[in-house]
Regions:
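Short, basic (Lys/Arg/His-rich) helix/loop patches that form interaction surfaces
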Residues: 77-80, 148, 178-219
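DNA/chromatin major-groove-contacting recognition/catalytic segments
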Residues: 128-133, 137, 142, 234-278
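N-terminal core-binding DNA-recognition domain of tyrosine recombinases/integrases
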Residues: 1-58, 73-77
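Catalytic-site neighborhood detector that most strongly recognizes the C-terminal catalytic loop/helix
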Residues: 61, 120-124, 159, 221-246
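Active-site/catalytic core of tyrosine-dependent DNA strand-transfer enzymes
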Residues: 67, 132-191, 272
Length: 278
């Protein structure tokens, strides 16, 4: 009942259904860790009455040109808070669309050679991501400088040990990060909405347009199933099909034009008109 009350409260605060679903699924993941399925305390139907589905939305990713601008803009030309927000955004993109929560919870020990080995906060799935050369200078510049720091980046409060308090700390950091992204877009991409989800959706979408198989994209994102990935990409599949349809029509029309040209050339030869050649 309290979970349902929380859902109602979120709706009263104008929360979107996908946002509510994210909160509920995050709570469910935490609950499953504290009370694993099969334990005496576990209640299998605890989340049955609340919204945990994902609705396919209009596209939330950037175009290739927009992403290129964010990757090539000189960070030194931006205000300090925007510099860090854009640096984290770039790293999330370079790390195969890593969610901000996973970036925030990364630990120093997760760096193994030239890779990051970590468990996704949402699913517990282990991920291994190679650090590309484009990310190495950012990683060096923005990682925690404190020698005894547990976390790779100075996002979470080192002194907080309680899981619930640490998650509250993460939510504050997330709000601060999104505000930094708002300032960034006001400066670099006016009228474009960018949030913490955008790096992940952009990576998936651009990979899709590059021709990567959905199964490969799903594995790269650490999705629990291909269906989740299809939800990410559904708004873009119609666009891709429409573009393919345009290409098909153009190729057929041009083929007809080529045939008509050849027919005309034959006719000209037949009636004795010289054929102009290039």
């Amino acid at each position: 009942a309290r979970l349902k009350d929380y859902e109602v409260w979120l709706r009263q605060k104008n929360g979107k259904w996908n946002t509510i679903s994210t909160y509920m699924r995050t709570l469910r993941a935490v609950y499953n860790r504290v009370c694993p399925p099969g334990s005496a305390e576990y209640r299998p139907k605890l989340f049955d009455g609340v919204y945990t589905r994902v609705v396919s939305q209009t596209k939330r990713s950037l175009t290739e040109d927009q992403m290129r601008m964010l990757l090539t803009t000189d960070l030194a030309s931006l205000p300090q808070d925007v510099q860090r927000a854009l640096a984290y955004f770039r790293l999330m993109f370079f790390f195969r669309g890593m969610p901000f929560i996973d970036l925030a919870y990364l630990r120093q020990q997760d760096i193994q050679g030239n890779s990051i080995v970590y468990c996704r906060h949402k699913t517990g799935q282990q991920m291994t991501v190679r650090v590309p050369k484009e990310a190495q200078s950012l990683l060096k510049e923005y990682r925690s400088k404190h020698p005894d720091s547990v976390y790779l980046f100075p996002i979470l409060d080192e002194t907080v040990k309680d899981d619930a308090e640490l998650y509250a700390c993460y939510l504050r950091a997330l709000r601060h990060f999104n505000k930094g992204l708002e300032k960034m877009t006001a400066l670099l991409l006016p009228d474009v909405k960018v949030s913490s989800y955008t790096a992940r959706h952009t990576w998936a979408t651009l990979a899709f347009y590059q021709g990567l198989l959905i199964g490969v994209i799903s594995k790269a994102l650490g999705h629990s199933s291909i269906k989740v990935t299809e939800t990410y990409l559904k708004p873009f599949e119609n666009e891709k099909v429409d573009n393919a349809n345009d290409d098909l029509i153009v190729s057929i029309v041009r083929f007809k034009e080529r045939k008509d040209y050849k027919y005309l050339a034959v006719q000209k030869r037949f009636i004795g008109i010289p054929l102009l050649t290039k």
